């Protein structure tokens, strides 16, 4: 059984999707801890309602980013996860902290990477005239939103889309994509044990398309 720790900064809608999917008999994973940089994050309340370890590790005034990350990951290590999932975690993790992690960490991003890393992805997709938009799951590395891509889900951009409407449509994709990716890791279909992700025993050359 894959032990998953989740990092989240906000309301926790993707955490809720992960929790719901984890209850399936063949899920292959369970969430063992939820951690946030925000003391009032809705994700923490969701975790506590589900009797899952939950903790806020907030950044202290003038605390270096690497020091905050070290405290965070020391707390995460207490639940002994095999995988860390960033599901709406809004802080950039320091390269120093990442270099000391002994387990893989993945992130859900609301664009079809490598397009539109960073923030405001929905408005940027519309401004660019993109025909498609969606979400991606990738391995977290020191480069922002640039780690190896694992899976994507895409939708067509419609003529009447606004950033808000597009965000809502992509969020529905996120709620399917993230649990599907974690299930694939739990079942060994996606292997993150080496420097290059593998799928079905061969190096993953392109992200899985999980529409």
Identify the function of each model-found stretch.
Residues 8, 65, 69, 167-171, ...:
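Amphipathic, non-transmembrane alpha-helical scaffold segments
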Residues 55-60, 108:
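Short beta->alpha connector loops at strand-helix junctions that form conserved
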Residues 36-37, 60-61, 65, 69, ...:
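N-terminal glycine-rich "phosphate-gripper" loop used for MgATP/nucleotide binding
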Residues 16, 193-211:
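Short, basic/aromatic-enriched C-terminal tail that caps enzymatic domains
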Residues 21, 29, 83, 87-200:
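Donor/substrate-binding cores of folate-linked one-carbon enzymes
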Residues 1-42, 46:
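N-terminal Rossmann-like dinucleotide-binding module
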